[in-house]
Structures are given as C-alpha cells and as structure tokens.
C-alpha cells in the first residue's frame, strides 16, 4: 500500500507523467506552526536541475496545501499537499514503449499489473518521492518544534572514492548544534552534498562517468541528532526496523546499516559493546558503536545510519532488453538527459523518511501528544 | 507492537525466564497439511546446545499446538503454539540486578518501561525468537506446499575470516534443487552453518575468541529460491522493505543488503543493470545483481539477502557499566557460559522471518488464497 | 485516522470551508474501466440543492482525478480525486464564532484540538463525505464489474411516519434485477428517496417541520444484492462489524441493525433461525431473518441493513449554548438556510460506505484479485 | 483477522473443543498492578452454569497467565493468558456431523474454509469469547486504575417483556458511584442480570420458552461512566464506530444504538439537540440524548449503548436443514442441553469489548501513556 507510518501516516499518490503528485498526512497533532514555505524549501532541495549533476528539466514543483492548516497552524485534520505536473511534454515514446529499461521496474510493473506507464516509469519513478518530501517536511517541523531534533544527511562515498568525513571520524563534532548548522551549509553548497575534503575528486569521477555515458552510485550517511532515549519498541516495531523499512523502500537503496553496521561483523564483543558511565546525572555510552539504538529503542546518542545507493539505471549507453510484443531480444537506447548520479537528490528524501519514522514512533512512544501540542 | 505481517500475521509473546513463550499465527489459509513435528524440527535448529559454539543449557523447547489445526490440517483459524520454559533455575542475580549489561537492551528497557527483567533480558532475550520460528515454520510449509519455494541460509563470514561460498560465486549452483538439498545437509552438519572450504579456519577463530573470553560476529546470506515474479508492492510495502524490516528486527543485526548491496555503490550503471533476454518463452535477467527484487516486486530470480551479525554482547570479560541505585560507575562480570557466537543460531530465525514475509506478501499479492488452499 | 478499509483503502481529507476536499483510494486492482463521469454521477446524488429539502447552495462539486487512471482504466496505483470548494463565501461568523452549536461537534473539536473551524464545522461537516462518495463510486464500480453486485438505499421512515416499503414486506421483489432498476428510478425521483406509497404524507411532515424552524430524522434501509457466499471473516473483522463501523462512522447515524435487528430480541429461536433447504444444487435459507450474514460471513442472501438518522442539528430556532470566551450561558441563533432533513442526502453516502466495505472484504476474502482484474 | 484494537490490541485464539482458548494482549503499558484473580473474576461472570438459565456444564475455565506480568505488575510486554479446555467429552456427533445447524455459522464456515469443527462450532462458538473477556479484564483494570472509569451492563428487555430500568428513566441515578456499586450487586444477583422490578415476569417468560424447547433474546444496555471528554477521533476511527464494530462483532448481536438511537429518528432537531450550560467552570449538556458521543468524540457525559441479542440458535426443537453429503433436505435435532437465553452471559463480554475499545482510544488519544503509567 501507499501509506507509511502508523500514528503519523503519510499516504503518497501520483505518477511521473500524471496530472499531479502529492501526499496526505494524517496524525499530525494540532497547533504546529507551519507554512507552505517550510514545505516548499524541502521540495526545492530534491527538485531536478539544482546542480550540474542533475537533469536540467527545470520543473517548478510548486506546492499547494489544500487542507489541514488554518490560520498558520495545523488543525489536527489531514494535511493534503500536492504539486501539479508542468512541462511533462509529450515526447516520442514509441521507441521504448514496448521495451522495458534494464534496472528499472518497467518489466516488473508490466508483469504484475498488466500495464505500465511508458511515459517515464509512472508510479515507480523517483518523481513520486515528492510525496515523501511533503510528508517529511511536516514531520521534520514537528520533531524540531517539540524536541529540537535535527536530521542531517550527506554523502560519504561516490563511486569508488571514499570521503574523509563521516560520523565515526568526527563523533565530537556532532555534539555542537552550531557545528551541525555549519555542516548543513557546507553540504547544501556542494553539488554532491559531500562535506569531504576530496569532494572535487569525486566530482571528477562523476564527470568522467558522464563522458562514458554511464552513471555512478554512492553511500549516504544520515544522522538523527537530539532524539530522546526510549523512542521505538521491542521486537517488531523497532526504531531500526522502521528506519530500515523506510530507507530500503526508496528504489535506489540496496543496503542499509546502523552504527558500525557491516563492520561490526568483524569486531570482538569487547570492541563492539559500548561501555556505560555516569555523565553528571545521566548514564551515557563511552562510544556509539551501536549507532544510537539497542533492541529497538533509542539510547539517547545520535542515531547513525548509512545506505548504499546504486548507480542511476537510466544511462545513454545501448543496453540489451526484449520486446514485449514480438518477444524478441532488442537493444534499447534511452534518449534524453539523465541524472548521472542521484545520490545528492536522494538525501532530502532519506531525511524525510527518517523524520516521518521518528515522528511516528515518538507519537506511539508517548513523547508527542497525538492530538495537540 | 509484537505482531509481524499484515495478511499472514505472527504475534509473539513471552520472556526468557517467564512461564512460557509462543506465537499466534493469524491468516494461514485452511487445508495446509502440517504437524507439530514440522514445527518442532525448526525449533530444534535454533535450540541452544546443538553444537560446541552454543551454550550447553539443554533446553528441550518442546512445542505444544493449542488451536488452529484439526485432523492434520490448518482450519483457517488462529494457530496458537507455545513452549513452556523448563530448567530456568533461579540463580543468583544479585550481582547484575542493578547493573545493566553493555551491548544489551537492559538499560533501554529500564529507562523506557521503569522495570526490567534482570533474570536474563526478559522480552529482549534472543529466547523470544522461539515465537518467530514457530511462525516461520508454518509460513515455510505454506510457501513450499503451494509454490515449492525454498529458503536457505548460511554464514559467509565469521569474524574477520571471509568464506569462499556465496551466491555470487556460485549463481548456477542455485538453479538445481538437488544442489540446494545437498547444500542444506552440509550446512546443518557444520557447527558454524558455513559451507565454505575454510570453515575450519573460522572454527579456530571462534575457539581463540572463546579462550580470550570474547565473542565473534559474522555475515549470513539468505537465499529465497522459487519465488514467482510479481510478489511485493511498489512504494511502501515493498518486498525488500518488508524483508529489511523483518531482518533488522532481529536484535543482533546491524546491517542488511540486497543483491550486490553495498558493493553496488561502487559499480557503474552499465555494470549494475541486469540485461534482459528471452529464455524460451519467458524474459530473464542475464545477471542477478539486483538480488531478485526491483522496485518492491520480485523479478523471478532468486532473492539474495545478506545481514551483518554483531558479536554476542554477553562476554565473560569484565566490563564497565553503572549502578542504577547508587548512580556510580561499576564494573560488571557476567557469570555463566555464553554463546561465543550466535551467527549459526540466528540462521533459522532469519529464514523464519523471510518465510513469514514471503507468505504475507504472496497472500496480499494474490498468489495464495487468503481463505483456503 | 482518516483511512477506511484494509485492502481497499479510502483516505479522505478536507474541510467544509477549506480549498478542496478529496480522497485517495489505495488497493483498487488495475484494469477496472472507470471514468470521471462514473464518479461525478455519484457526487451529484449527494450534492446540495438537488431537491426542495436540501439547501439551495448550488455547489457544483466538480470532480478532478489526478492519478491512478490511465487510458480509461485503473493502473493499480493510488487514485487521487478532489473537488475544489467554490462559493464558500466569507460570511459573517462573528455571532457564532465562540458559541458552539448544540448537536454539532463544535465544542468537542474545540476541547480536543484547541481550535475549531467556526466557518462551518471544518472536518466535522457533512461536506467531508465528498471523500466517502469518491471512494464509494470506485468501489461500486469494482464490485459491480467483477461480481454484478448492486447496492441500493432508500428511506423507510421519515420522522414519525412509517413507510410501507421495506425488504421484509417485499422479499421476492428483490430477487429480480429489473425490479431493482425500477425501484432505483422511483427512489431517485422522490425528494425523500422514499419508494413508499405514503411518501407524500412524509413530505407534508417535513414541510410542517420547516414551518416550525425545526428538523426531522428518519430510517434508511440499504440492500446489498448479489454478494457471494463467504465474504467476511470470523471474530473481529466481520462483514457486519465492518459495515456497522462504516455506517456508525457517519455523524448523523445513531443506530444500526442487520436483518430483523432489534425486532429479533422479541422472537423465539424457532422463529428467528432461517431453515435451510436444497434449491436445485445449492443450499438456501427459506427466510432471511439474519439479513444475509451469519458469524461474520455472508450467506449469499441479500444483505439487509437499517440505520437511524437523527434530525439535522442545524435549526433556525433559538437554542441554548455557552460563550467560550466569557464562559457564560448564551443563546444562539444559526442564520442561513439549512437542510430540514438530511436522510435523502445520506443515502448515497451509506451506499458508498457499504461498497467500500464489500470491496475491501472481497479482496481480503480472495474474491477479487488484489493486483489486477 | 483475530485482533481487535490498534494501540491496545487483543488477539484471541482457540476453538470450543480444542486444547485451550486464550488471548494475547499487546500495548498495555507497564506498571499496572494486576493479578490472575482480577481476570479470573471476570471469566467467572461469563462461565456457563452460573444460573438456572445457563447450561449446567460446569467448566472450570481456570486462567493461566504465561507472560507480561512480573512481580504483580504489567511489564509493557505482551500478556498471554489462556484457559485449558476440560471435560469437553467426545460425544457422539455422527448425527449432526454433516447437517449444519440453522442459525449457526456451521454452513458458512464449511463453505468458506472447506471444513468445520462439527464438535461444537469451533471458532464460531460463544466459547471463544473467553479471549475477549481476558483482554477486557486487563482493559477494565487499566481504565479504572488510571481514570476511575466504570463499565456496567444489564438487560433492559427479555423477549417481549420490557424492563422498567434503563439510563433514560434514571439519568440522575448514574451520577453517584455508590448507586452504581449497588446496581452492580443487584445485577449480579439476578439470574437475568436485570435490575428491573418486573424481572420475575421475565424469568417466567424464559421458563415458559424452555418448556416449549425454545429460546429467547433480549436487549442489553451498557453504560460507560467517567470517560473524559475528548476520547475518540473524527471521521473513521470514531469512538461510536469502534464500539459499534466491537459489539456487532459478537455473534448474537443484531442491532446497536447510541443514546436515543432508533428513537432519535422520530424526534425533532429541537428535541434531540442537547443544550449546553455552564456548570460551575465546565460546560455540560442539559440532557444526554446523544449518549455521550458527538462526531466520534466523547462529550464527558456517560456513554449509553444498547444492543439487541437474538434468541440462542441452539434449540431442542426439530429443525429443517440439509445433508452436506447427500445434498438432500434433512431434519436436525440438536441433543444435549442449551442455554435458553444467552443475554446475561453476553453482558460481561460486551463490557469487555467496551473496555478494550475505550483503553485503545484513550491510548491513541493521548489520555493514557502507551509505555508506562
């Protein structure tokens, strides 16, 4: 189904070449101050055309809020927001209409539903994440307004180039809010949203792939700062399980890890366990190998998450596919321009999914009143 | 909450040192032939004491089915199964009663619920996965009986030692059912459930860690063989999202990947995309880099999943913690014997979660009738 | 929350005086032929101003479909439909802004959410049932297209005047589809949607109440014809429980009954039980006292439901209330014109809720494929 | 499915002649003091054999709690409770094995699931309400402990005999807690759980039906006292909708009403609307025609609900049915003794469902902390 969350629920709808795309947000308590601009800002961060590594289609993605906000505040009723599609010009699809693109969900959708929207992936297009970002913008506002929680994302690896900036190289850095604000500015001013010193090297790597008519993936790190202790549930409705499901639900994601993640498989127990100590009146972990979550529940340390993003499947190179009508092998050449890398544009989407997950579990864990704040 | 699944639902209950642990399975269609023995066999696979790397507590874990099966077949009503705890002798907990164990959820539970079951982790104990395995055994039977789907798991890495057997080194191997049966036998006869040639080296690695009073993690690969094309949903209720949530919900899991996973971040689009070709009358992928899932929906190729398991947090070494009464730093020494590695025992649990997820989505995708088979 | 249904889900949003109202329909299988006109027709049936007993505000309620339908058929993706509000002129609310209207949810909303939309009830307005009707129109089409199921509603009582036409007076009548078509025409041509011979008497009753600046209630009967045997579930997700929840969810409904309903409390078991007999090759009930449902599951006989509708709470008479600012008792006089009876306008809304419920349970019971038809 | 509730969830399982029946309660916050005896007392109220109007099968219905309670308090983990079946002697079912009983769900289950438990209805038996009562007992304790809410039920009509005691004849009576305690005692000492002066007349009416080998229905009123203002939600997850779904989910229930219910259809708006006035510092309704709920949300007045209970379908009279093997009409005579009326035994079940619903919505409305109290 197209709904994410149990107590703070986001239902998204819309196709890449339909009339509009949007989301209905249900379960946001009343009295949250929020404006259309707050949400528009987040939409602008994922909009195409914002850097050299993004398709130059200059979609405006202008938000309209149709319900749920009255006199500048949420009312407790569902918030409906949408973006009308503009400039989705009817181009010539005849070449690819019956030839599913490798790496895309075209064939899958066709076999499952008996139809697919050949005009650009329909519901499987990355464009549908507009709904995620609308929902995420409200969730971000809610958790920041009530608990001063910040969510920040950046790339730590592009293709084969490792960056030099990640949480575990800089744990103390993340203890200061002003550091985080400076970091955010740095990220937003970088075309790869990468705060590493060697980001120019990464840039060249992507430019080189563009020359080869190819595409590139990467790794994104998401930090959730300020989440109180106790958010999440044991067993099945875990904080990490919900975050994992949220992130893996983004089509390009092929891997997910928390804290030390895959590296933890190589450590001894005595290396991995975070020792406790008294820090003034509260109990803290000396390290944060666990990434801020144990047994489904937040520890109070920053939550550290990483995802692997596959290279964009749309490439200009000729690829091998089949023709669905003739049932014969057929080469396919996807015209137009494509994002050579979607890592930077996925970042606000992952931040949105993190925000929705945290808002949802903070309501169900009793940290945010479900009716009004 | 303690329920997993939407259409095939497993609700687990019970604590490590309570009277019993169990599961209620709701949504299994009627007419599935199943016996207590089928379920008991799976429970035996996760039972402690089955190898040198598992605690010698010889819990019997004897299953009782109390409802939902009549005259050897499911009836369509909820299946309630449980295991009474035996031999959970009341030992002396006074030393650790007020000192949360690092790496465990003790402190988290205490801060969240205002209580914790100091007798062995209560609900956060690995022992609660008995419920997962009861549910998984029914799900395995359902998907094997109706669609001949097989789920097989094994370790591919122990501590720092990489194995030489995994799906990508042997893709053709997995095309034969008799190969899979032989593989299963090999796995079950190995104390680390590792089919690699160098498993003795891994064994030594674990024995060495035991000598050091330490513990070891590893990586597990789970293959789902025979899943038809079209299982799963776009956007939020994706096959990969549900599997991710299911696996990450197991306490020791710190990372999850599908297909090429984290490696995909290093590939070019032209390397990662699986080309299509006509194989007799059906469309197949030349490779399976995507791991059998695109856009939330199964492609018909084997589903390939990998998880990272952290080292067991219970170790005999002295560790640093705090006393919850005195609010002072305190060393903790956890007595008794512990599993130096839980990787092999987690395998049947992950297989169970995979089976429940697949059963659930096959019902909601219309592959298995929700009422009767 | 604002979502109804589990497998066929309708999420409604919007307020009476907001920018727009609408619904997102999730879980409708692909390939259902449907047009905007199909949905518009149902919206027209609940639109104000269609008879002398309805407010003369001539809202156009023009539907727009923004997603989920491609080339005249559903695609399996969420269907988003909405109606922009027009002519909700900003009138002078100063008199009633702080004085909750008796019989309305104004006070309740204010105390719960700390705000209320004084411009006409906001989310508690009957106008929000536009979303229900959009969802219901799709559901009606789905169950009619796949199983030829018809849902028909009419009033059987207006105020104190009992009608002479209901299911139990005419059980054989409902066995013919052409009878049902004629009945539908008769209902739609009657301002009270009442097929009884004495409907003129009822009309006078309402006119008399209008003269007294008062309002009138009534009883509605809903028949679901053609529902196959086996729809619904035992215990908690029952056909009757879901229908009851759906109907009671409409604000004006204060009572709900199935089959003989409250009358069944007066019968002996030997009178109430429907005997079985062989009718050609199938087993039928001689009577249908149970109203087509036993134990949560449809019997194959027509489903017979009745609801009690309270008189419209908006009346022109002076009423007693309190001022929320001064905390003093205050009289309130609600200006403008109001529906003296909403019974006829509630009928398409109840039909919609019945259709959504039946569609939802037919999918979860395996009668309609969840992916494509 | 077999789960009721969203935030306070009760999953019931078990069949009338299986090994055991029980419930898993998920979402009860930690720190609620509760004993097995608290739950056993409620089970005793619904146990057969407690009066002359109940089958003399003296099932002990001895409760066992297997998880979720530690040192006399809930722990926040799932509470698993069950009752082992005893003395379900294997009697001779050969006469009725293939002949579905009129008024029961036998035929329905058989056609839906391809099997039915001929030994006494299996999952459709009233005996499965043991699970409801286990869940309800915990919910009652939770809402009484945290908010002093009382739920009380009694019969107001037996067969054709109207009682003289109901809420609307005695609204002031219900304002005193000591009155309610006295009322409860009177109810529990009456074999029909009827506090009316003419209950002896009702008793004779049932005895007369027993002589005729027939059965009798009735009407039950349930009062929820002390529920705070604001519980419930607009639109679909309404307090009245949830209560309706909960009550209609009990097999014998054929009608449900709130407040004036069906009578409200006969009233004018000016009669039905409850006027507001200032009562010291709070706003109260002068009357409670609405039954304590408007627009999905509690008003703070007592919640008044009524249900119609059909006569017990099991009667000793010869009835007409069909043989499922021979497909011929066949008479059926159901041997053994049966409850001539189940109205009094249904009362604790309805109270349980009311308690679960209120607990669930108080958690989701922010009145009860979801984690710990």
Swiss-Prot record, chains A, B, C, D:
Q: Which reaction does it catalyse?
A: 5-O-(1-carboxyvinyl)-3-phosphoshikimate = chorismate + phosphate
Task: Please provide the Gene Ontology terms (biological process) for this protein.
Answer: amino acid biosynthetic process; aromatic amino acid family biosynthetic process; chorismate biosynthetic process
User: EC top class, in one word?
Assistant: lyase
Function recorded in the entry: This reaction introduces a second double bond into the aromatic ring system.
InterPro entries assigned: Chorismate_synth, Chorismate_synth_AroC_sf, Chorismate_synthase_CS
- For this UniProt entry, which segments traverse the membrane? none
Please, which domain of life does this record's source organism belong to? Answer: Archaea
Which EC numbers characterise this protein's activity in its record? 4.2.3.5
Cite the binding residues for NADP(+): 46
Keyword annotations: Amino-acid biosynthesis, Aromatic amino acid biosynthesis, FAD, Flavoprotein, FMN, Lyase, NADP
Q: In which pathway does it act?
A: Metabolic intermediate biosynthesis; chorismate biosynthesis; chorismate from D-erythrose 4-phosphate and phosphoenolpyruvate: step 7/7
In this chain, FMN is annotated as bound at 123-125, 251-252, 295, 310-314, 337
Q: Which GO terms describe its molecular function?
A: chorismate synthase activity; FMN binding
What organism is listed for this UniProt entry?
Answer: Methanococcus maripaludis (strain C5 / ATCC BAA-1333)
Gene Ontology cellular component terms for the protein in this record? cytosol
Q: Which family does it belong to?
A: Belongs to the chorismate synthase family.
Q: How many cofactor units bind, and how?
A: Reduced FMN (FMNH(2)).
Q: What is the protein's given name?
A: Chorismate synthase
Q: List, separated by semicolons, the cofactors it needs.
A: FMNH2
């Amino acid at each position: 189904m197209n709904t994410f969350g149990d107590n703070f629920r986001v239902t998204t709808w819309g196709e890449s070449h339909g009339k509009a795309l949007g989301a209905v947000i249900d379960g946001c308590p009343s009295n949250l101050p929020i404006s259309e601009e707050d949400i528009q800002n987040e939409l602008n961060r994922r909009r195409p055309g914002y850097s050299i590594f993004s398709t130059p289609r200059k979609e405006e993605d202008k938000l309209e809020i149709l319900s749920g906000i009255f006199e500048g505040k949420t009312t407790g009723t569902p918030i409906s927001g949408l973006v009308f599609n503009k400039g989705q010009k009817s181009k010539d699809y005849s070449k690819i209409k019956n030839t599913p693109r490798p790496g895309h969900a075209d064939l899958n959708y066709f076999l499952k539903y008996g139809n697919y929207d050949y005009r650009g992936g329909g519901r499987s297009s990355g464009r549908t994440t507009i709904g995620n970002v609308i929902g995420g913008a409200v969730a971000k506002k809610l958790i920041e307004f009530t608990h001063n929680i910040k969510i920040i994302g950046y790339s730590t690896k592009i293709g084969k180039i490792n960056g030099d900036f990640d949480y575990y190289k800089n744990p103390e850095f993340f203890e200061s809010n002003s550091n985080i604000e400076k970091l955010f500015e740095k990220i937003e001013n970088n075309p790869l949203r990468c705060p590493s010193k060697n980001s120019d090297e990464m840039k060249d790597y992507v430019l080189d792939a563009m020359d080869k008519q190819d595409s590139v993936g990467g790794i994104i790190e998401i930090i959730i700062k300020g989440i109180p202790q106790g958010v999440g549930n044991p067993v099945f409705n875990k904080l990490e399980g919900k975050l994992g499901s949220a992130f893996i639900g983004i089509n390009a994601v092929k891997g997910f890890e928390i804290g030390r993640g895959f590296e933890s498989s190589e450590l001894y127990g005595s290396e991995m366990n975070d020792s406790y100590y008294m820090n003034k009146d509260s109990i803290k972990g000396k390290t944060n190998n666990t990434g801020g979550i144990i047994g489904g529940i937040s520890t109070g340390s920053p939550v550290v998450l990483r995802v692997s993003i596959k290279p964009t499947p749309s490439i200009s190179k000729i690829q091998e596919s089949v023709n669905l009508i003739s049932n014969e092998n057929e080469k396919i050449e996807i015209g137009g321009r494509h994002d050579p890398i979607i890592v930077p544009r996925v970042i606000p989407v992952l931040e949105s999914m993190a925000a929705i997950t945290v808002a949802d579990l903070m309501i169900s864990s009793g940290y945010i009143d479900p009716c009004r704040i």
